[in-house]
């Protein structure tokens, strides 16, 4: 009878020790820069900018774009694609892109939509397209590749910034 409380007490002590283990860096010791656990992104951002407001579906994004009079930026990507991952890292870490992105309705998709206007030159990733508040796909705002018009690479951040500004500027002159 006495063994059960003693066993429970020992189990609690072991569990408390495990949970309360000192994880702070001691003075003079090097901090391990590699975290053993991967950082989980916010559900809708999928790591593209956790502080930004993202929409869940294409239909919701179109509605918000029209009602808020903001352009829509759609990012097509895949979690397992190394090109998508590289672009995501640059997009999320670039302060200027993140600041400018606040002026858009944002949607990132890991699946294709039924709207064929969003894949005029094929279904490839990563692909970034813009839609204006009148729900017109901005086919004129393209990346630097002739065979993948809406593709961007990590080195294309200046072009992406220019295209984001173009989407905002043309929005103001058209309305």
Curated annotation (Swiss-Prot):
Summarizing the annotation, the consequence of altering residue 63 to A is: Disrupted dimerization
Keyword flag Secreted: yes
Q: Which cysteines are joined by disulfide bonds?
A: none
Please list where the region (Required to promote cell adhesion) is annotated: 21-40
According to the UniProt entry, where does the motif Homodimer stabilization sit in this chain? Answer: 45-54, 60-67
Q: Name one GO molecular function term.
A: identical protein binding
What GO CC annotations are associated with the protein?
A: endoplasmic reticulum; extracellular region; extracellular space
Query: Which segment of the chain is annotated as a signal peptide?
Result: 1-20
Q: What is the effect of changing residue 64 to A?
A: Disrupted dimerization
Q: In which tissues is it expressed?
A: Expressed strongly in trachea, lung, stomach, colon, prostate and small intestine. Expressed weakly in pituitary gland, salivary gland, mammary gland, bladder, appendix, ovary, fetal lung, uterus, pancreas, kidney, fetal kidney, testis, placenta, thyroid gland and in estrogen receptor (ER)-positive breast cancer cell lines.
Its localization reads: Secreted; Endoplasmic reticulum
One record GO biological process? positive regulation of epidermal growth factor receptor signaling pathway
Q: Which residues cross the membrane?
A: none
Write the record's keywords in alphabetical order, separated by commas: Disease variant, Disulfide bond, Endoplasmic reticulum, Proto-oncogene, Secreted, Signal
List, alphabetically, the CDD domains matched: AGR
Q: Quaternary form?
A: Monomer and homodimer. Interacts with LYPD3 and DAG1 (alphaDAG1). Interacts with MUC2; disulfide-linked.
**Family (UniProt):** Belongs to the AGR family.
The protein's role, per its UniProt record: Required for MUC2 post-transcriptional synthesis and secretion. May play a role in the production of mucus by intestinal cells. Proto-oncogene that may play a role in cell migration, cell differentiation and cell growth. Promotes cell adhesion.
| Recorded disease | Respiratory infections, recurrent, and failure to thrive with or without diarrhea: An autosomal recessive disorder characterized by neonatal onset of recurrent pulmonary infections, coughing, wheezy episodes, interstitial lung disease, and bronchiectasis. Episodes of vomiting and chronic diarrhea result in failure to thrive. Results of sweat chloride and pancreatic elastase tests are normal.
The identity of this protein, by name, is Anterior gradient protein 2 homolog
Q: Which organism is it from?
A: Homo sapiens (Human)
